[in-house]
Amino acid sequence: IDGRYYWDGGLVSNTPLSQVFDAQPRRDSLVFQVDLWNARGDLPQNLLDVAEREKEIQYSSRTRTITDMQRLGQHYRRLLRELLEEIPEDVRSSNPWCRRAGELACDNRYSLIHLIYRDRARFGHFKDYQFGRVAMREHWQSGLADIGRALAHPEWLQLPTGENAFVTHDATA
């Protein structure tokens, strides 16, 4: 476009969770993750099914991986905060490594509600670029039903308590 090149950011990540969780300053967060690709699917019966399933696996595995990495990262940040509490304050304030560790450590809490789009089989392997009127209306109706299922669990909207500072709720399970 006008001499500039563009590409689909979905090739890197359809859900930019890293940017949400890594934003500074870190804050307790309620996050709705909309995943347009289903990690669970039927065994392909033909080559068209294989192409569709390949995309589902390719795109959905990244969102799960990113979620798992963020959960682990928050666990380590919390552990680091707890370890720093064992170091005397005068050492923490004067030691550059302790100061840097203090910048990284946090005790924030995250509740992630995962909405997984369960699509109609008829969109096939081209569903990543299917934006026709019928397809979009079905997507919107499905999304409305998914968010309704999520909101039927008001406890999911609360931040986690106790040792587990990062929880994930699957609204389409």
Where are these regions (language model features)?
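Non-catalytic peripheral regions of patatin-like phospholipases
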Residues: D2-Y6, G10-A173
